[in-house]
């Protein structure tokens, strides 16, 4: 999946800076993914950050904040590695932010706009070899609900101003809901592109499942936060150690 999404972005948006963060005991991307990506596209605009770690929990919120600190553009896209969108959806989202219509855009529809793709190796090869012809996925895709996961395009300053990603959410569960809620509570202009998103099916560890050990902690934190008004949210985020640390990193 990371081969597909990274190659797709570099191919369709050759001037965009793509930053990828990998946290593992050793780098799989460098030796397994990167050589394949280089067969299809230039990687001059790709930055790969590797962090060696024995941590068993996928700390998505921390990684997203790491990526924000590493970025240097006025607009960023928090992009999951297992999805791609039609090219014009990215362009519509970018234009909405550049023209001031939105502070953040979810560039896919809410409802039944997800194409879940049974992504076998033959389908993978056909999609890349066809220069990303979406019709090659027709026999492998089926409709599933879509809401607010998978990422958003956002003004970098807006992400900082609202407190960035809440690093108290660890592993999977509720962090996307909380971020959307917070953007709305702080009065930011949240836009939407009504279009499809292609989600490539993959194996799941406990980090992507309701049974992960952190799921209830995340759920309980979200149930508490969702009852707060904007003033309470501001007070909470101003007291977070991670937020102070990130603001210091951003000022360096």
What are these regions (language model features)?
Residues 15-27, 49-53:
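Short beta-strand/loop segment that forms part of the nucleotide-sugar
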Residues 1-11:
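Short, well-formed alpha-helical segments that are part of the catalytic scaffolds
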Residues 60-65, 82-83, 90, 147-152, ...:
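Conserved glycosyltransferase catalytic-site signature
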Residues 68, 86-167:
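Conserved catalytic core of nucleotide-sugar-dependent glycosyltransferases
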Residues 146, 168-252:
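C-terminal catalytic/acceptor-binding lobe
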Residues 29-70:
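Active-site-proximal specificity loops/subdomain of glycosyltransferases
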Residues 75, 103-104, 190:
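Short, Asp-centered acidic motifs that coordinate Mg2+ and/or phosphate
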Residues 73-86:
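Short beta-strand-to-loop acidic/aromatic patch adjacent to the donor-nucleotide binding site
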């Amino acid at each position: 999946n990371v081969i597909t999404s990274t190659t797709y972005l570099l191919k369709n948006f050759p001037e965009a800076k793509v930053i990828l963060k990998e946290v593992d005991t050793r780098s799989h991307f460098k030796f397994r993914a990167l050589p394949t990506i280089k067969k299809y596209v230039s990687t001059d605009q790709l930055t790969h950050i590797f962090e060696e770690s024995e941590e068993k929990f996928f700390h998505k919120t921390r990684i997203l904040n790491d990526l924000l600190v590493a970025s240097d553009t006025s607009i960023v896209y928090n992009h999951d590695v297992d999805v791609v969108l039609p090219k014009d959806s990215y362009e519509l989202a970018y234009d909405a932010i550049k023209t001031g219509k939105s502070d953040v855009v979810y560039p896919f529809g809410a409802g039944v706009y997800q194409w879940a793709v049974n992504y076998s190796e033959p389908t993978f090869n056909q999609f890349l070899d066809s220069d990303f012809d979406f019709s090659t996925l027709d026999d492998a895709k089926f409709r599933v609900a879509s809401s607010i996961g998978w990422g958003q395009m956002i003004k970098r300053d807006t992400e900082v101003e609202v407190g960035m990603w809440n690093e108290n959410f660890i592993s999977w569960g509720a962090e996307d809901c909380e971020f959307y809620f917070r953007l709305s509570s702080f009065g930011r202009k949240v836009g939407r592109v009504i279009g499809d998103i292609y989600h490539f099916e993959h194996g799941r560890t406990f980090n992507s499942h309701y049974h992960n050990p952190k799921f209830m902690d995340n759920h309980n934190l979200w149930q508490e936060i969702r009852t707060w008004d904007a003033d309470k949210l501001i007070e909470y985020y101003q007291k977070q150690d991670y937020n102070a640390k990130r603001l210091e990193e951003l000022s360096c």
